Amino acid sequence: MSDINHAGSDLIFELEDRPPFHQALVGAITHLLAIFVPMVTPALIVGAALQLSAETTAYLVSMAMIASGIGTWLQVNRYGIVGSGLLSIQSVNFSFVTVMIALGSSMKSDGFHEELIMSSLLGVSFVGAFLVVGSSFILPYLRRVITPTVSGIVVLMIGLSLIKVGIIDFGGGFAAKSSGTFGNYEHLGVGLLVLIVVIGFNCCRSPLLRMGGIAIGLCVGYIASLCLGMVDFSSMRNLPLITIPHPFKYGFSFSFHQFLVVGTIYLLSVLEAVGDITATAMVSRRPIQGEEYQSRLKGGVLADGLVSVIASAVGSLPLTTFAQNNGVIQMTGVASRYVGRTIAVMLVILGLFPMIGGFFTTIPSAVLGGAMTLMFSMIAIAGIRIIITNGLKRRETLIVATSLGLGLGVSYDPEIFKILPASIYVLVENPICAGGLTAILLNIILPGGYRQENVLPGITSAEEMD
């Protein structure tokens, strides 16, 4: 945390400052570079895994940008009790990717068509978002149950689950498996090229180059794919010039079993939002305790929930505040929430043009896989850092070991608990839910006094891992 505190003292534009237009524009573009790839990637991954049409995937990407713009506008402007009033940027929540793929794949194997799959996934996301809205009013109680150990396990399980998706894309994706080209030299070569470029730029001293490493790696991989004839532009031919958000475009359907899974992920992601908003307040030189802090926290989580309601209605995956932008604030020294207005407007404008979303659907799976395999592994590492924030004593070790064992075990064979009632099985067949719920249960059951010496001597915080 010392680095964050130090960065806060070097702000060029503080929270309520109004930078000149050209400086606000530069700051906005810098933030967009940090979030653009992670923002559109979830829709691309879900679209590829469920083999959605190019038009549907492009629409998901466009709506992700528009919803992110609306959410960012709400967060930075703070209307009444809604919004943090900080430079909190909204983007698609990676926590839902594996859940959406699992639920959608199950429906697909049962013979459901694309429109019904989308209506169901977005329907349960719409209803589930109200859980986040309600959670904003009971944050002190949730924080007692969902501790850093619990939230760290959830983040770790998300990363570990996504690695499988990343490595499949690395080999060419699900389409390549169907065509028999999975893991050929072209796919592996392009994926490896992207991975090497991303690693190389992440070793640079320049924060700007490190931040843009993934985008640069994707560009290099895309150019290589063009040269190898791996890019197909046919999906862009019939796209309209402008896309207008169409509420419940695919209809509305609801499954209680799916809601249990999605609702659990929503509740577990609340603490992630709390951490992100706290970090944003810290780097913006605002209080991280007291009445102002609690008010911003409540407003930020409330906005998270309302924005996910809007996002699900127009056709986007659920949203959350993005941690990457805290690094941009530190790097640029610009914490002005008025820069957030510029970012919000730019995102909405970009989302209105489906050709932009359509272009991203032409990126070969191997290109995405090369970057995403590393990114998802870093998510897992972030989970480990959260787990050891307050040390890893014997009580926490038992919670982590049991949760990790059951969560990973379920990912290896999801049918192990099939004997359970359907309403319970639908929860525990998902590794993220299985690991997260186990952690919550053990955190409640195991006595708080069961705390002996640190199992990892000398490690008392995540900072000591640096």
From Swiss-Prot:
Molecular function via GO: xanthine transmembrane transporter activity
Annotated keywords: Cell inner membrane, Cell membrane, Membrane, Transmembrane, Transmembrane helix, Transport
Outcome when changing D304C: Loss of activity
Record's catalysed reaction(s): xanthine(in) + H(+)(in) = xanthine(out) + H(+)(out)
Result, substituting S423C: Highly active
Membrane-side (Periplasmic) residue stretches: 47-55, 102-120, 173-180, 232-258, 320-342, 385-425
An example Gene Ontology biological process: xanthine transport
Activity modulation comment: Inhibited by CCCP and N-ethylmaleimide.
Superkingdom field: Bacteria
TM ranges: 26-46, 56-76, 81-101, 121-141, 152-172, 181-201, 211-231, 259-279, 299-319, 343-363, 365-384, 426-446
Effect of P421G: Highly active
Known role: Specific, proton motive force-dependent high-affinity transporter for xanthine.
UniProt name for this protein: Xanthine permease XanQ
Organism: Escherichia coli (strain K12)
